[in-house]
Regions:
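Glycine-rich phosphate-binding "P-loop"
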Residues: 1-6, 88-99
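N-terminal amphipathic alpha-helix/helix-capping segment at the start of soluble metabolic enzymes
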Residues: 1-31
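Non-catalytic helical/linker scaffolds that mediate oligomerization, partner binding
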Residues: 2-5, 65-68, 75-83
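Surface-exposed amphipathic alpha-helices with a cationic face
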Residues: 10, 15-22, 42, 78-82, ...
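Hydrophobic faces of well-ordered beta-strands that scaffold small-molecule active sites
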Residues: 28-31, 49-51, 89-93, 121-123, ...
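Glycine-rich, proline-tolerant flexible connector loops at the mouths of alpha/beta enzymes
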Residues: 37-38, 44, 48-74, 93-100, ...
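Conserved anion-binding
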Residues: 86, 97-100, 104, 110-155
Length: 155
């Protein structure tokens, strides 16, 4: 997409987000599930695009986010990444893909990153997922922290 509203075309990275926070700058974030919307959101200068498990509701018409699969999230993640030049792209790991073991969490995280080329992942949960998140980070995968948020299990 030609031109960015903000005029800033530099790729947003996790390091850059930390710098923005330290300077007290506002950080913008919107959700996208597809190539075309991702181009529009990215072109508007949004800093972070979340490929949320809410695609289950918005794109597939499900009542909850629980039915969405890892492969469906990968599809949406790939579509969004292809449409983005500037924004940092975060992909949700869907419920049930990281809760049973740290090994499963890392395996699924690596799969999503290798196939989608996203910039970071997001897992929902609290203290019960800390060890899985630590292993994912140790594998070199950035995590967009949302500890304490458990929307998927409280629907």
């Amino acid at each position: 997409m030609a031109g960015y509203i903000s005029g800033d075309t530099r790729k947003v990275t996790t390091h850059r987000l930390v710098e923005m926070k330290q300077r007290g700058e506002k950080i913008s974030m919107l959700t996208s599930y597809d190539y075309t919307t991702a181009q529009i959101v990215d072109g508007a200068g949004i800093d972070v695009i979340l490929v949320g498990d809410s695609a289950s509701n918005v794109m597939a018409g499900n009542v909850t986010t629980l039915p969405i699969t890892l492969d469906q999230m990968i599809y949406h993640g790939k579509s969004v990444v292809r449409g983005v030049k500037r924004a940092l792209v975060v992909v949700d790991l869907p419920f049930g893909t990281y809760q049973t073991s740290e090994y499963e969490a890392v395996t699924n995280a690596i799969k999503v990153m290798k196939i989608t080329h996203a910039d970071a992942l997001k897992l929902e949960g609290g203290v019960e997922i800390i060890d899985a998140v630590k292993k994912i980070i140790a594998a070199g995968i950035p995590h967009h922290g949302t500890f304490g948020v458990n929307a998927a299990i409280y629907q």
